């Protein structure tokens, strides 16, 4: 009988594939997890027990950093957020929703603008101009596929788990297929009637990339922000949080308070108007406890 630690890299039909120092072990979880209403997730660090006959059982889930998405990925270090230039159309509202959600989850984000080859001229230039603002406030931004192919593997450090996320049909699985040639994820066509992608990824797996792992998750076009506390929302807009230290009042919500540094920077054009408008819209959404109409 021996114990080994590893990372859950796949889940299929009740079996867990766990990467250990000795290689990948396919195992099942002990019934105690059902009793505790716990379920191991892809990305979990776990302990497995291997008996003298070579049978193995997952016996312990080690403490998690986080657990994101459905199906879930645990211990996510970084999000590679794929936003399309077209098909589906580029959306600052959707971009801000993703960034706010992952900021709330305390996960760093790198932005990749996909399908730039399908859009030319002034429209593409305007999108890149908008994204330059996000780069200025601290988000790494890629608009060229070849840069992503070369630099993302270099950015994934030892033991890190990066997760692809973004709107349906933005090209996450296509990107993964290029980054990891044996990924074999199914890529699907766009559902033109809804201007959304078909949900083509049906499971979550981790693939070795760089010194860590990359996961693909099912595409989704909406994020539920209603669990966020209203008075904390402003903390998840990174430039608002930085500016708030100069606000006159502690806990300033950047609405009509006097001496608000965020409103001052907004008037000076140093904070993007669209970001502030999205902040106000999210406040309304959270206070009313419902998704906006365009996401229903």
Swiss-Prot record:
UniProt keyword terms in alphabetical order: Cytoplasm, GTP-binding, Hydrolase, Metal-binding, Nucleotide-binding, Ribosome biogenesis, RNA-binding, rRNA-binding, Zinc
Cross-referenced CDD domains: S1_YloQ_GTPase, YjeQ_EngC
Principal subcellular localisation of the protein: cytoplasm
Cofactor: Zn(2+)
Molecular function as annotated in GO: GTP binding; GTPase activity; metal ion binding; rRNA binding
One GO CC term on file: cytoplasm
Enzyme class: hydrolase
Subcellular location: Cytoplasm
PROSITE patterns (alphabetical): ENGC_GTPASE, G_CP
PANTHER family (UniProt xref): SMALL RIBOSOMAL SUBUNIT BIOGENESIS GTPASE RSGA, SMALL RIBOSOMAL SUBUNIT BIOGENESIS GTPASE RSGA 1, MITOCHONDRIAL-RELATED
HAMAP family for this protein: GTPase_RsgA (MF_01820)
Name of the protein in question: Small ribosomal subunit biogenesis GTPase RsgA
Lineage, highest ranks first: Bacteria, Bacillati, Bacillota, Bacilli, Lactobacillales
